[in-house]
């Protein structure tokens, strides 16, 4: 996870 509560830069759910 890179962006908490959304999509990270790989497009995976956090």
UniProtKB/Swiss-Prot annotation:
Superkingdom, taxonomy of origin: Eukaryota
EC number: 3.1.2.-
GO biological process: phenylpropanoid biosynthetic process
Tissue: Expressed in stem, vascular tissues and tobacco mosaic virus infected leaves.
Coiled-coil intervals, chain numbering: none
Main EC class the enzyme belongs to: hydrolase
This protein's pathway: Aromatic compound metabolism; phenylpropanoid biosynthesis
GO molecular-function terms, A-Z: hydrolase activity
This protein's UniProt keywords: Hydrolase
Induction note: By pathogen infection.
Protein name: Feruloyl-CoA thioesterase
Source species: Nicotiana tabacum (Common tobacco)
